[in-house]
UniProtKB/Swiss-Prot annotation:
Keywords from the UniProt entry: Endoplasmic reticulum, FAD, Flavoprotein, FMN, Membrane, NADP, Oxidoreductase
Primary location: endoplasmic reticulum
Organism: Salmo trutta
Residue numbers binding FAD: 399-402, 417-419, 423, 427-430, 600
Compartment list: Endoplasmic reticulum membrane
Flavodoxin-like domain segment(s): 25-169
Transmembrane spans: none
Family of this protein: Belongs to the NADPH--cytochrome P450 reductase family. In the N-terminal section; belongs to the flavodoxin family.
EC class of the enzyme, as a word: oxidoreductase
MF-aspect GO terms: flavin adenine dinucleotide binding; FMN binding; NADPH-hemoprotein reductase activity
Binding-site list for FMN: 31-36, 83-86, 118-127, 153
The protein's name in its UniProt record: NADPH--cytochrome P450 reductase
Cofactor binding description: Binds 1 FAD per monomer. Binds 1 FMN per monomer.
Length: 601
C-alpha cells in the first residue's frame, strides 16, 4: 500500500461528486455481509424512479466530516443504512465514521437525514449502531426527517425494510414537493456488453480483486485477495443425526497468514454446478459467453456488479448468491418478464407491501426456501434476460467459521468445524478461498487466570484452539490456571464432537475439567446451563476469587441467554446480590473483557 498515492480531496469528497453529477441524495451504508449495501442501492434506485439524483456511498471511501457542507446542495438528503456487528459495534467499513461521530463537535445544521438500522433481536445490543447514528446526528444539529427504521434479521428483515421504505418515499415526495409517480417503472443500472473476440487472459475466472491472482498468489491476503488453500483433512465428526458436522484442515504453508486462537476464518463458497447449469438451460443461454455489465452511471465508483469481463458461468458460480431466497426487489423487477398473466400477478403481489402479498412472499419464498431456480421452475412463463438477473442477484458472501486450532501447535494449518446441511462431497471444495478476521475472543494475557469455556454443539470450535494453546503453554513450563469446558450434544454415541481429543486433553491435564451435557440421554433434558448451576461453588470461586475469564460460543437465541441467566443466579446466591446487582456484576466482567461471547442466531 505504501507506493499508492493518497486519494485526492476530489476523490474523497462526496459533496463535490454530488455537485458535479447533479445529485441531491446520498445513501451511506455500514455493511458487513452485503445486506446494508444492497438496501442502500435499492433506496438509491428508488430515488431515480422519482426523478431525484442519488448515489449509494461507502463511508470508508469518503471524508465524512463533509456532512457539514451538505446544506450547500439544495433539497439535499443523507440516508443511512447502518448494520450492527458483533457486540453492538459498527461494521468494518463504518468504523472510521463511528469514530468521527464520537469525536466531532462540528455542527450539522442544515443536514436532513433518516436512518434504517439492520440488526438481530437475539443479540443484546440490537441495532445499537443504527440507533447511535440516529441519536448522534440529531445531537450535532441535523434534522431527522423520518422515523428510525428497525430491521430484525431474526424475524423478517426484508419485510421490515419494505414496510419502512413504502412509508418513507411518500413522506419524502411530500418533503421535496415531488410527484409520486415513477413507482411502476423498472430502472436498469447496468448495460450488457458481449465480447465475441477477447483475449481470454483478460477474463476473470472467479478472482475477487486482481486478475490472475489465483495463478500468482501474493500476500497480504484479505477479503479482496483471499488465499487458495488446499483442504488436507475432511472427516465427519458425528456418528449419526440429521446434520453432518465436519472437521476440516486447510493448509496455509507459505501464505504468511498469521492467526490467534479465537479468530474467525472467512471462506468463499462456490455454487453447485448442477444449479448453475440448470439456470443456463432454463434461460436458454450459452453460459460460456464472455460478457461485461457496465454501469450506466459513468460517475459511479462501482463500475460493474462483479469483476468483468467474465462468463455467465463464472458469475453464477463464484460471484452471485443464487442459493438464498431472492428479496422482493428482485421479484419486482422480474415480474415484467412473465408472459402468463397469473404468473405476473403472483410475482408482482409478492413484491408488494400489501398484506396478502407479504403473506404470499412469506409462504411461497421464505418458508419453502425457494431460490431463484426453484421460482423460475415453478413459474414457467417467467423467463427474464440473464443479464438482468445477474444485475439483480446479490453478491455471494464469505462464510465465517471460528478457528478450531492454535497457531502455536498448528502454525501451517487452520482447523474448522463446519455443518453441512446436505451431506454430499460436492458441498466441500478441495480448495477454499480464505482470509482471517480478527476477533475479540482472546485467551487471557496472564496464563495463570482460569478460563471457563461454554460451547455446546459446533460452539466448541474455538475452544479446541484454546485447549491446544493452554496445553502448549503448560508443556513450555508456564504456570497455567484451570481450563474448564462445558460442552453439550444430544447423544454421546451420535454427536459428541471431538470426543477423543477432549478426553485425551483431559487425561494429559491440558483440560482441567470436562463437563458434557447430553440433552437426550435421560427423561429430563440436560443442557450446559444445568451443569453450570450444579458446579456453582467452583464457578463462583474461579470467577470471584481467581479472576477467571468466561467465554460463550454458539446459539444466541436460547443458549447464550440461558447461560447468562445461570451466571446471574450464581452471583445472586453465592455473592449475596440482588438480580440488579448480579446483572451489573456480569456487565462489568464484559466491560473488563472477562465475559466474551461469539454467538450467532
Amino acid at each position: 500500500k505504501l507506493d499508492q498515492p493518497a486519494p485526492s480531496t476530489q476523490e474523497t469528497s462526496f459533496i463535490e461528486k454530488m455537485k458535479k453529477t447533479g445529485r441531491n441524495i446520498v445513501v451511506f451504508y455500514g455493511s458487513q455481509t452485503g445486506t446494508g449495501e444492497e438496501f442502500a442501492n435499492r433506496l438509491s434506485k428508488d430515488a431515480h424512479r422519482y426523478g431525484m439524483g442519488s448515489m449509494a456511498a461507502d463511508p470508508e471511501e469518503y471524508d465524512m466530516s463533509e456532512l457539514s457542507r451538505l446544506a450547500e446542495i439544495g433539497n439535499s438528503l443523507a440516508i443511512f443504512c447502518m448494520a450492527t456487528y458483533g457486540e453492538g459495534d459498527p461494521t468494518d467499513n463504518a468504523q472510521d465514521f463511528y469514530d468521527w461521530l464520537q469525536e466531532t463537535d462540528g455542527q450539522l445544521s442544515g443536514v436532513n437525514y433518516p436512518v434504517f438500522a439492520l440488526g438481530d433481536k437475539t443479540y443484546e445490543h440490537y441495532n445499537a449502531m443504527g440507533a447511535y447514528v440516529d441519536k448522534r446526528l440529531e445531537e450535532l444539529g441535523a434534522k431527522r426527517v423520518f422515523d428510525l427504521g428497525m430491521g430484525d434479521d431474526d424475524g423478517n428483515l426484508e419485510e421490515d425494510f419494505v414496510t419502512w421504505r413504502e412509508q418513507f418515499w411518500p413522506a419524502m415526495c411530500e418533503h421535496f414537493g415531488v410527484e409520486a409517480s415513477g413507482e411502476d417503472s423498472s430502472v436498469r443500472q447496468y448495460e450488457l456488453k458481449e465480447h465475441n473476440d477477447i483475449n481470454m487472459n483478460k477474463v476473470y475466472t472467479g478472482e475477487l480483486g486482481r486478475l490472475k491472482s489465483f495463478e500468482t498468489q501474493k500476500p497480504p491476503f484479505d477479503a479482496k485477495n483471499p488465499f487458495l488453500a488446499p483442504v488436507t483433512v475432511n472427516r465427519k465428526l458425528n456418528k449419526a443425526g440429521e446434520l453432518h458436522k465436519m472437521h476440516l484442515e486447510v493448509d496455509i504453508t507459505g501464505s504468511k497468514i498469521r492467526y490467534e486462537s479465537g479468530d474467525h476464518v472467512a471462506v468463499y463458497p462456490t455454487n453447485n454446478t448442477v444449479i448453475v447449469n440448470r439456470l443456463g438451460q432454463i434461460l436458454g443461454v450459452d453460459l460460456d459467453s464472455v460478457i461485461s455489465l457496465n454501469n450506466l452511471d459513468e460517475e459511479s465508483n462501482k463500475k460493474h456488479p462483479f469483476p468483468c469481463p467474465t462468463t455467465y458461468r463464472t458469475a453464477l458460480t463464484h460471484y452471485l448468491d443464487i442459493i438464498h431466497p431472492p428479496r422482493t426487489n428482485v421479484l419486482y423487477e422480474l415480474a415484467q418478464y412473465a408472459t402468463d398473466l397469473k404468473d405476473q400477478e403472483n410475482t408482482d403481489s409478492m413484491a408488494s407491501s400489501a398484506p396478502e402479498g407479504k403473506a404470499l412472499y412469506q409462504s411461497f419464498v421464505l418458508e419453502d426456501n425457494r431460490n431463484i431456480l426453484a421460482i423460475l421452475e415453478d413459474l414457467p412463463s417467467l423467463r427474464p434476460p440473464i443479464d438482468h438477473l445477474c444485475e439483480l442477484m446479490p453478491r455471494l458472501q464469505a462464510r465465517y467459521y471460528s478457528i478450531a486450532s492454535s497457531s502455536k501447535v498448528h502454525p501451517n494449518s487452520i482447523h474448522i468445524c463446519a455443518v453441512l446441511v446436505e451431506y454430499x462431497t460436492k458441498g466441500v471444495a478441495t480448495t477454499w478461498l480464505k482470509y482471517i478476521r480478527k476477533s475479540q475472543f482472546r485467551l487471557p494475557f496472564k496464563a495463570s487466570n482460569p478460563v471457563i469455556m461454554v460451547g455446546p454443539g459446533t460452539g466448541i470450535a474455538p475452544f479446541m484452539g484454546f485447549i491446544q494453546e493452554r496445553g502448549w503453554l503448560k508443556e513450555s513450563g508456564k504456570e497455567v490456571g484451570e481450563t474448564v469446558l462445558y460442552c453439550g450434544c444430544r447423544h454421546k454415541e451420535e454427536d459428541y464432537l471431538y470426543q477423543e481429543e477432549l478426553e485425551q486433553a483431559h487425561k494429559k491435564g491440558a483440560l482441567t475439567k470436562l463437563n458434557v451435557a447430553f440433552s437426550r440421554e435421560q427423561d429430563q433434558k440436560v443442557y450446559v446451563q444445568h451443569l453450570l448451576r450444579k458446579n456453582k461453588v467452583d464457578l463462583w470461586r474461579q470467577i470471584h476469587e481467581d479472576y477467571a475469564h468466561i467465554y460463550i460460543c454458539g446459539d444466541a437465541r436460547n443458549m447464550a441467554r440461558d447461560v447468562q441467566t445461570a451466571f446471574y443466579e450464581i452471583a445472586e446466591e453465592l455473592g449475596g446480590m440482588t438480580r440488579t446487582q448480579a446483572t451489573d456484576y456480569i456487565k462489568k466482567l464484559m466491560t473488563k473483557g472477562r465475559y466474551s461471547q461469539d454467538v450467532w442466531s
